[in-house]
Amino acid sequence: MSALQENGQELPYAGGILKLRIPFVHYRIEYQDFIQGAILSCVPLGITAAMVKVLGIPIEVAVLMVVINNFLYLLHTSFGDPSVSGWITAGIPLYISYLTGFAPGPERIKALIALQVLVGGIFLVLGVTGITRWVIRHFPISMRSGILLGAGFASLMRVFNPAQPFMGKMPIAFIIASLGSFFILFSAKALRFRAQSSLFAWVAGFGIAPGFVIGYICGLLTGEIAPPTGVFDRFIIATPLGDMVSSFTALGIGMPSASQWVAAISLAIVAYVLAFGDILVLEAMIDDCNKSRPDENVVFEVPRNHVITAFRNIFQGICVPFLPLCGPQWTGGQALVVNRFKHSTPEQEPSYWGGATSIFWGMSLAMIFHPFVQIVLPAKLIGFGLTLLIQGYLCIYLAFAMCKTNVQRGIAGVMGAALVSANYVKLWDSAFWSGPTMALIAGAVLFFLLEYDGSKEEETVQ
């Protein structure tokens, strides 16, 4: 497989400008990432409860929407974008607040359609014009680091908050799963054991899967996790495609009114501001990949990521309205793929693209099989919590490594704190003044006040 590419070059592709890469032709399926994805299949199903409550969608339709959304993630890695994509997660409380201002039923669905299509339009315009690429190219290191720190702190605060279920409801199972996963993924001893033992290297290749399984078993033994039920109620999930199209899409209920389009504009802008941080995190992780594995050049192009994200939002907005919207990256999944690729040899994992694609093949296919989902569903909090921990760890160490001066570190720290402390808070009765907006403003003011020197060209990440 590694013969397909020269040392340090981009993996070959078909399709010209589209950079189409096909499984078993351009890369192999990495069964370790496939299994990690299958285990995490229960995590995206967690949004179905909110979809049922807020949108009035039957649970079978909500599950079908999640499955369709998951398969569309494959558009990124199939067409040359290294993103392990996901939702625009940070804005979910804002979307729910916005939607509850409309009458339940078709009007509320139309409000979501307007919001999601407008978000897609913003991604499309900024991607095609290259505006975002220019902004990122000139984005100060201190502010990049601040966004990474904020993302890391936000993840870890959720895990260690006693009000959250991770430590509150299953402390023994979650702590054991976390310690096992962190040892395998990040320990210096584990890296040495990988080189000394082929068996340990094989087990470590599964990433969080060993820790998840051990934590699951401990949870069953301690009673912190309930045994799975309804495993064999059916084999394949229900697929009420006709009901979904006729009752919950623009194809069945029509397009939003003019007033609904106007009402969604400000929140659509907020959603893009939230997603902008994910783009910076993605770029930092891919850069980390290229430094750790110089045998392959993984290319991240902001316009490509934007255009694919735009297509997902516009298509889903019309045909599969999706409450969390479609974002450019899922940081937790990205961290798992990046970490395994970094610590694998070219023989163990020949190409980044095999792992980045396999995690979603595993997740998407597993969600179709009802028995498998019912087996892993009781431990979904362990899987979700592990991704948050790993996301927080990687974001924080990348943020620290990025800064070169104490001024940059100070700006990054203030910006990260602003992002976390103001998150989900609407100041001046406006959703725009949420945590990410305040963090960007605070970071920009401090950069120009403390760091910027107009007499010389500022250092930026190219």
Protein language model regions, located:
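Helix-loop-helix hairpins and the membrane-proximal interhelical loops
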Residues: 1-59, 196-200, 204-300, 459-462
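Helix-loop-helix junctions within the multi-pass membrane cores of secondary transporters/permeases
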Residues: 14-29, 36-47, 81-151, 295-392
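Alpha-helical transmembrane segments of multipass membrane proteins
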Residues: 49-50, 71-75, 98, 124, ...
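Loop-to-helix transition at the N-terminal end of transmembrane alpha-helices
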Residues: 55-78
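Membrane-interfacial loop-to-transmembrane alpha-helix junctions, especially the N-terminal start
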Residues: 60-62, 301, 407-412
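Residue-level recognition of pore/gate-forming positions within transmembrane alpha-helices
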Residues: 66-70, 89-90, 444
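Membrane-embedded alpha-helical modules
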Residues: 109-225, 354-462
